[in-house]
Amino acid sequence: MAGSAGGRLHRLHVPPAPPPPALPQSIAVDEFEWGMRGTHLQVAAGRLQIHVYNRGMDDHDLAVIDAQGVLHTVPLASGADAVLAVDVSAGPVKLFCSLFAGTPDSHEAKGMAFNVTAK
């Protein structure tokens, strides 16, 4: 029989895989004309702390919709930074600049949006 010696099976001991690293509960986001980038693509569901920096020359804001569907925004002058804390549910979370929302000139339409996934 394959894998046996003298009729006995030898089993390899395979240690259990280590647990996956904990997902972050905070994220840093840079805003600039006309884009956004963040430090993480996945975050922990629950309380999320967002540290946002306006690296652009224009004024912007950061907008995020929390787990209850409430829109939170923080205004950012050029060169400013701020911290926004919101509760997020598991699933996609969109962070965006809400200036000129609903118009063709909205900052979101120009590329100022960043998606993370809460797990």
Residue ranges and their predicted role:
Residues 1-11:
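Secretory targeting and sorting signals
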Residues 9-28, 35, 57, 76-119:
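Extracellular/periplasmic metallocenter environments
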